[in-house]
Amino acid sequence: MPPAGYLLGESQTKEPSEKRCYAFFDGQNLYHSARKVFGCAWPNYDPVLLANRISADKGWNLIKVLFYTGIPDQHENPFWNQFWVKKLAAMGTRGVQTYSRTVKNNREKGVDLRLGIDVVRMAITNQYDVALIFSQDQDFTEAVETVKETARLQNRWIWVASAFLYDQAYGKTAGIMGTEMIRIDKTMYDACIDPTDYRTRK
């Protein structure tokens, strides 16, 4: 049996020597995980640094970084609305493709749905060989299975990995089932912090 994440086509397809990687970030899931596991007070991670670090460690050629998040309504929560508006704008100047929508009561299903659709759509259109998903949301297992079926139908080699925050003292955490699970420890996380604080000062 192939290891988790290794998705085969109808036959034993050849592993490409250069693996095109797309990194998909579930922004809110990563933030809440950082808050619980590492005690971070705000989303201080840098998606570009994280994606580059893991891609380099794995020998993958990072092609694109995609970031998805809900944003609170500016009237209901102006603090976090402005934080995300500024952080997303900064990401855009660095080539990150961002997707956001206004959400209420922290309901992010529309955002998660878009991320899952993009993972599947970009597999079908052969845009990547590796999907690196920064999330622990098990709702994405369905998208992973669809990518697996795409690999079989198109007789292609595709790898799906999920990166998640890990601290032994916190307890058991894991990535998305059916993927290669990549741990991000505190040392790696601290090396990939965004130096800019986008919080509005009072």
Spans of model-derived segments:
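Domain-level signal for Mg2+-assisted phosphodiester chemistry and nucleotide/NA-binding surfaces
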Residues: 2-109
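Nuclease catalytic cores that cleave nucleic-acid phosphodiester bonds
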Residues: 93-202
